[in-house]
């Protein structure tokens, strides 16, 4: 039982939350290289559009969850990457789309082979009449895209859940940084000293 508890704690402690931005890769020069950002379209619902810069987002590598934080006076809610109708969005939902970020930065998820930059998607505020929405639907003005993540090298990854509790209660943690090549270089925190102390405490 102690052995299983140690394995479970170790797995949770290695999970990280990284800062990322998303960009479109396409053979169509009109949309290639544009960043994904969100616009309010409803209650805790932000549709994803293409613009000059990508929005600052987070990636939970344990849950495979891309999200941004919506902060109110009393709570903080994760608005997660999901599909609302024909348009990809950031929504306050538990039914988010699990995403794997590959070493080359490309995103793998269910439906990733049919992603388009599309205008005129009939969004509530009609932003798509002048801007490209990220959609799974072709319209009269569409271009196929691949979504690529870029990790923010200047922002250290934040540890989640148990890792924070372990490092704070067991003393200073020893961090090491490893970077992938290209767009997928990401900052990972590896908790050595803190985890060793916690494991020792469990065994004793």
UniProtKB/Swiss-Prot annotation:
Major location, coarse class? secreted
Give the range the annotation lists for the signal sequence. 1-15
The membrane-topology field of this record reads:
Lipid-anchor; GPI-anchor
As for subcellular location, the record says: Secreted, Cell wall; Membrane
Knockout: what is the outcome?
Leads to a significant reduction of cell wall mannan and to decreased virulence with a diminished induction of host pro-inflammatory cytokines.
Q: GO biological process annotations for this chain's record?
A: fungal-type cell wall organization
- Prosegment location in residue numbers: 183-204
Give the CC-aspect GO terms. cell surface; extracellular region; fungal-type cell wall; hyphal cell wall; plasma membrane; side of membrane; yeast-form cell wall
Q: What does this protein do?
A: Component of the cell wall involved in virulence. Does not seem to have a major role in maintaining cell wall integrity but plays a role in the relationship between C.albicans and the host.
Q: How is it modified after translation?
A: The GPI-anchor is attached to the protein in the endoplasmic reticulum and serves to target the protein to the cell surface. There, the glucosamine-inositol phospholipid moiety is cleaved off and the GPI-modified mannoprotein is covalently attached via its lipidless GPI glycan remnant to the 1,6-beta-glucan of the outer cell wall layer.
Q: What conditions trigger expression of this protein?
A: Down-regulated during yeast-to-hyphal transition and by fluconazole. Induced during cell wall regeneration following protoplasting and highly overexpressed after treatment with micafungin.
Write out the entry's keywords from A to Z: Cell wall, Glycoprotein, GPI-anchor, Lipoprotein, Membrane, Secreted, Signal, Virulence
Covalent lipid sites (GPI-anchor amidated glycine): 182
Family, per the entry? Belongs to the SRP1/TIP1 family.
Q: Does the keyword Acyltransferase apply?
A: no
**Full protein name:** Cell wall protein RHD3
High-level lineage:
Eukaryota, Fungi, Dikarya, Ascomycota, Saccharomycotina
């Amino acid at each position: 039982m102690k052995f299983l508890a140690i394995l479970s704690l170790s797995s949770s402690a290695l999970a990280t939350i990284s800062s990322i931005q998303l960009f479109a890769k396409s053979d169509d020069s009109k949309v290639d290289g544009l960043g994904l950002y969100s616009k309010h379209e409803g209650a805790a619902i932000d549709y994803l559009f293409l613009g000059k810069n990508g929005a600052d987002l987070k990636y939970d590598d344990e849950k495979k969850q891309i999200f941004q934080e919506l902060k109110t006076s009393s709570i903080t809610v994760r608005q997660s990457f999901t599909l609302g109708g024909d348009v990809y969005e950031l929504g306050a939902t538990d039914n988010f789309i699990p995403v794997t970020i590959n070493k080359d930065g490309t995103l793998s998820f269910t439906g990733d082979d049919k992603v388009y930059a599309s205008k005129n998607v009939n969004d509530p505020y009609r932003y798509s009449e002048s801007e490209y929405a990220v959609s799974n639907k072709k319209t009269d003005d569409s271009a196929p895209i691949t979504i690529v993540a870029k990790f923010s090298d200047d922002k250290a990854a934040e540890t989640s859940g148990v890792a924070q509790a372990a490092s704070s209660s067991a003393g200073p943690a020893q961090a090491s940084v490893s970077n992938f090549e290209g767009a997928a270089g990401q900052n990972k925190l590896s908790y050595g000293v803190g985890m060793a102390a916690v494991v020792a405490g469990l065994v004793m």
